């Protein structure tokens, strides 16, 4: 065994921007709590904003999306129709961020926000190992 075998790789926190409809705040909270589990190699630095959708919000939001490496869109019943979610996703693509969706309600009809379709982003069912793999893939 050489010197380098003793060095463990330095893990960086994943800076994740979570785009969601406020009706699905419970899902955002659950995702962040599940990410804290020692069972999974997953950490979030939460950059989501919960303020009115206006110019000031957009400026702050763009800064936070820019600081993140990934945008996750939590797809609930009405996510597809939310102006702020669509703006966040389009801004994420514009800034060159990795973007993917997570379906919150597996047994219900879920419509995806148009940017996820337009940019052919992957969408997964809620499953932490799958989310971890998606975050760690190139």
Model-derived regions: residue spans:
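C-terminal interaction surface of TIR/SEFIR-family domains
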Residues: 1-17, 106-138
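Short beta-alpha junction loops
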Residues: 78, 99-109
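Short catalytic/ligand-binding loop motif for oxyanion handling, primarily in non-cytosolic enzymes
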Residues: 25-28, 81, 107-112
